[in-house]
Amino acid sequence: MLPPPPRQPPPQARAARGAVRLQRPFLRSPLGVLRLLQLLAGAAFWITIATSKYQGPVHFALFVSVLFWLLTLGLYFLTLLGKHELVPVLGSRWLMVNVAHDVLAAALYGAATGIMSDQMQRHSYCNLKDYPLPCAYHAFLAAAVCGGVCHGLYLLSALYGCGRRCQGKQEVA
């Protein structure tokens, strides 16, 4: 024999207390767009270096590009999902963390761009039309351009964050 049907419907499940919500204003903000461009240019930078034959100081440029690509990816998703307040000690100062990250990234990308420009000049001998051996000149040229773009993008986002801070705002977007 079947039990009688319930008189009341079962209670609705509550949304999880720490539910993840997409922060749509961040996607449309200048910093959100800059972060996406930084991720694209940074990926182009380190993929260009990684696919060429490199040695010596180029290892530093590759380290800088991969490190800041991963850090930028983390900052982007923590801000996009609104979970930056869960980061111990730094979550309450999220705008300043972003500015410090951008200033450091701009400085180190500037150094990496200088390294790639130097390597490009050192390999300029093989930039001849009929040079028969493989040459990393074009890869280093592309990496130097991508590094300069990354440097500029991080500098822009640092200036944007400083401007927001000077206006008295505490939030990234």
From Swiss-Prot:
Domain of life: Eukaryota
Family matches, as InterPro entries: Marvel, MARVEL-CKLF_proteins
Gene Ontology molecular function, alphabetical: structural constituent of myelin sheath
Extracellular domain ranges by topology: 51-59, 116-138
Residue ranges crossing the lipid bilayer per the database entry: 30-50, 60-80, 95-115, 139-159
Predominant cellular place of this UniProt entry's protein: membrane
GO biological process, one term: myelination
Residues in compartment: Cytoplasmic: 1-29, 81-94, 160-173
One Pfam family here: MARVEL
Modified-residue entries (N-acetylmethionine), positions: M1
Signal peptide: none
Misc. comment: Down-regulated in primary multiple tumors derived from ovary, vulva, uterus, cervix, breast, testis, kidney bladder and liver. The reduced expression is owing to DNA methylation and could be reversed by pharmacologic demethylation.
PANTHER family in the record: MARVEL DOMAIN-CONTAINING PROTEIN 1, MARVEL-CONTAINING POTENTIAL LIPID RAFT-ASSOCIATED PROTEIN
The name this protein goes by in its record: MARVEL domain-containing protein 1
Taxonomic lineage from the root: Eukaryota, Metazoa, Chordata, Craniata, Vertebrata
